[in-house]
């Protein structure tokens, strides 16, 4: 039952997710592609976490943050991908009112935590390159744990705010969500409550997370660039640049898609374009991050070779 009588209103008890396409052939193709991407995402990020745990050479701050980033990437992808895959297999994909709120909150939680972790990683690179003599003190285990815990708390607070407002909305009319997951924007359009205040508050909260983390990243890399340009050694410059390249690539991909989805005016792109970019943000990026950090990082490549060597010798 999709509707329930509540007082003088008919409340929605479930939503219909319209997904990416109605074409049956394209649904099969997309199911196969996205399933493969999801499996690579899980295996790639799990491998990153395990490699960092078993390799003593990787037991320092940058890889501590990277292991948590891998966990968050798995969480972000898993919050929407399994349900999206189900959408391809059945004609009418429904999600309960409670399930919709939980899915939306999980996606926002992991998305927010990723922003904070990327900022923490930028700060770590700043300390390593600009203040190498103080690095071990300023980036102690205690400080790293505090930064990671702070990232999770920040993500929890942002997601809790969105969950609070979602469950305060009254949905009494159409229940067809033109998306492949319960995103806040299309749900607001379906609400028959006054959403003006909630939209302002949530926009401010999400905008604050984005602006604060972008500011930290921008300032960190500004100082890093100044420090690198002052280096006289070409080898030193190359080494400093190489330690930042992977993180800069991940930051560019992540914030580039966030900007397209949440910052650009809705009139400038269609709903279908928004869906495609959302797939890249929530499905592709979690798969790409382990590849970005492993292919461009000599320490990780060295750790992989050592672990494979140990396995071969057994």
UniProtKB/Swiss-Prot annotation:
Potential odorant receptor. Its main location: membrane. Residues 1-28, 79-102, 158-199, 262-274 are extracellular. Residues 50-57, 124-136, 221-240, 296-314 are cytoplasmic. GO terms for biological process: G protein-coupled receptor signaling pathway; sensory perception of smell. Glycans are attached at residue 8. It is a multi-pass membrane protein. It comes from the Eukaryota. The chain crosses the membrane at residues 29-49, 58-78, 103-123, 137-157, 200-220, 241-261, 275-295. Belongs to the G-protein coupled receptor 1 family. It is found in: Cell membrane. This is Olfactory receptor 5P72. Keywords: Cell membrane, Disulfide bond, G-protein coupled receptor, Glycoprotein, Membrane, Olfaction, Receptor, Sensory transduction, Transducer, Transmembrane, Transmembrane helix. InterPro entries: GPCR_Rhodpsn, GPCR_Rhodpsn_7TM, Olfact_rcpt. Disulfide bonds join 100-192. It comes from Mus musculus. The keyword Transcription regulation does not apply. One of its GO terms (cellular component) is membrane. GO terms for molecular function: G protein-coupled receptor activity; olfactory receptor activity. Coiled coil: none annotated. CDD domains: 7tmA_OR5P-like.
């Amino acid at each position: 039952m999709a509707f329930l009588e509540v007082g003088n209103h008919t409340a929605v008890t479930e939503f219909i997710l319209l997904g990416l396409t109605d074409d049956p052939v394209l649904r099969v193709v997309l199911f196969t592609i996205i399933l493969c991407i999801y499996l690579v995402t899980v295996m790639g990020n799990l491998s990153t976490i395990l490699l960092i745990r078993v390799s003593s050479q990787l037991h320092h701050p940058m890889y501590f943050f990277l292991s948590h980033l891998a966990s968050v990437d798995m969480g972000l992808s898993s919050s929407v991908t399994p349900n999206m895959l189900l959408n391809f297999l059945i004609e009418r994909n429904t999600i309960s009112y409670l399930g919709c709120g939980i899915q939306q909150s999980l996606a926002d939680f992991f998305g927010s935590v990723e922003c904070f972790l990327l900022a923490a990683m930028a700060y770590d690179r700043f300390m390593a390159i600009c203040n190498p003599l103080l690095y071990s003190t300023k980036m102690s285990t205690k400080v790293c744990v505090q930064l990671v815990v702070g990232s999770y708390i920040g993500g929890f607070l942002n997601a809790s705010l969105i969950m609070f407002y979602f469950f305060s909305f009254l949905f009494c009319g159409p229940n067809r969500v033109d998306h492949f997951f319960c995103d806040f924007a299309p749900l607001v359009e379906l609400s028959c409550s006054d959403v003006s205040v909630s939209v302002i508050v949530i926009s401010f909260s999400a905008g604050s997370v984005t602006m604060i983390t972008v500011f930290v990243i921008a300032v960190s890399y500004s100082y890093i660039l100044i420090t690198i340009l002052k280096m006289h050694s070409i080898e030193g410059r190359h080494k400093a640049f190489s330690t930042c390249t992977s993180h800069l690539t991940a930051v560019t991909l992540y914030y580039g898609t966030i900007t397209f989805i949440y910052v650009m005016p809705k009139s400038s792109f269609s709903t279908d374009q928004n869906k495609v970019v959302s797939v890249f943000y929530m499905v592709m990026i979690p798969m790409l991050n382990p590849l970005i950090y492993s292919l461009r990082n000599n320490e990780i490549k060295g750790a992989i070779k050592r672990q494979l060597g140990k396995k071969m010798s057994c």
